[in-house]
């Protein structure tokens, strides 16, 4: 029909469509690989930061209940106990992981819940002792602190009871005091003698208590202080640093593997070729010229422009480039043995052997024609 497009235009459109489709697929594949690589690097960065945080940051706070025990084999008619209350607290998580980290200062406190009973108010001051021990039960540290209830007058107690009477009736409040006894203000773990437990003893046989807890709180300084007080900022900086470092490594590896633009290898291969050429010069067999029958063999020596014969022809030829080397043609009936070069880009010329110098009789018998037939090998001066 008249309105139909020409066939070459359709073919051109199909080819352009195939080319564009191929480029689109290639571009999508490249974007997919790039997205997966970035996602993998991000995951590795988060994993590295999490591993560092878990291994570097110790336990911030550890709270362990303290269960006191005492002897009961004495006379029960008295109101006092048979012995001082004693408790043994283990400083290990699940019996394996230690709570304390080497070199980290800790604040160790004992929290006592004491009722405001007349017995406790009449106690006055009493002593609390803690003894830390290591493996085998050996004591490595001991500390003692004195404690007493806070004083409250009779009028203050009556007003407090009237004010919180409704809460006291329904059990939402209690008439008790929570005493916090600081046993260690700066306790540091010894790496050679680790602490495995603590023995707590209250030096009072008439004390009454609801419960007790041993709290260990880490006192951070330096980098640990920043990681604990600014966790989100430190996490962002740490993950970004890891991601940047890994991205640079992957980028340089890709450039070296695909392009080879960072560390080109042609210089190294050039040095290897030069060394192989020098070795071939020293180890190549020398050329032996042979003349036709009826002609006497003569010695061909390299003559420089100054008229001096060089001792090492290979050193002179090594300074010539491929364009400056003269083209050599063999004599009539001459058989040449040219060694193959170690690299195709370098062509080494064979060297002539130095024959023994002729005697005076043979030198005088040489005809002018023979001397004229000798062709000297042109070489460039080393200067």
From Swiss-Prot:
Residue ranges, annotated region (Disordered): 279-383
Family as reported in the entry's similarity comment: Belongs to the seipin family.
Xref: InterPro entries: Seipin
Protein name, per record: Seipin
Gene name per UniProt: Bscl2
Role description: Plays a crucial role in the formation of lipid droplets (LDs) which are storage organelles at the center of lipid and energy homeostasis. In association with LDAF1, defines the sites of LD formation in the ER. Also required for growth and maturation of small nascent LDs into larger mature LDs. Mediates the formation and/or stabilization of endoplasmic reticulum-lipid droplets (ER-LD) contacts, facilitating protein and lipid delivery from the ER into growing LDs.
Feature: compositional bias, Basic and acidic residues: 322-332
Modified positions (Phosphoserine) in chain numbering: 289, 342, 345
GO BP: adipose tissue development; cytosolic lipolysis; fat cell differentiation; lipid droplet formation; lipid droplet organization; lipid storage; negative regulation of lipid catabolic process; positive regulation of cold-induced thermogenesis
Observed phenotype of the null mutant: Mutant mice display increased early postnatal mortality rate, reduction of total body fat mass, nearly total absence of gonadal fat and great reduction in subcutaneous fat. Mice have enlarged visceral organs, markedly steatotic liver, decreased adipocyte size and number, and display decreased levels of plasma adiponectin and leptin, glucose intolerance and insulin resistance but not hypertriglyceridemia.
Membrane topology according to the record: Multi-pass membrane protein
CDD domains: Seipin
Segments traversing the membrane: 28-48, 243-263
Residues the record marks as carrying a glycan: 88, 242
Subcellular location field: Endoplasmic reticulum membrane; Lipid droplet
Organism: Mus musculus
Tissue localization of expression: Expressed in the paraventricular nucleus of the hypothalamus (PVN) and brainstem dorsal vagal complex (DVC) in oxytocin and catecholaminergic neurons (at protein level). Highest expression detected in subcutaneous and epididymal white adipose tissue, brown adipose tissue and testis. Also expressed in brain, skeletal muscle and adrenal gland, with lower levels detected in liver, heart, kidney, spleen, lung and small intestine.
Residues exposed to the Cytoplasmic side: 1-27, 264-383
Positions in the Lumenal compartment: 49-242
Assembly, per entry: Undecamer (an oligomer having eleven subunits). Oligomerization is important for its function in lipid droplet formation. Interacts with LDAF1 to form an oligomeric complex. Interacts with RAB18. Interacts with ZFYVE1 in a RAB18-dependent manner.
PANTHER family: BERNARDINELLI-SEIP CONGENITAL LIPODYSTROPHY 2 HOMOLOG BSCL2 PROTEIN (PTHR21212), SEIPIN (PTHR21212:SF0)
Induction data: Up-regulated during in vitro adipocyte differentiation.
Cited Pfam families: Seipin
Keywords carried by this UniProt record: Endoplasmic reticulum, Glycoprotein, Lipid degradation, Lipid droplet, Lipid metabolism, Membrane, Phosphoprotein, Transmembrane, Transmembrane helix
Regions of compositional bias (Low complexity) in chain numbering: 353-371
Polar residues composition bias: residue spans: 292-302
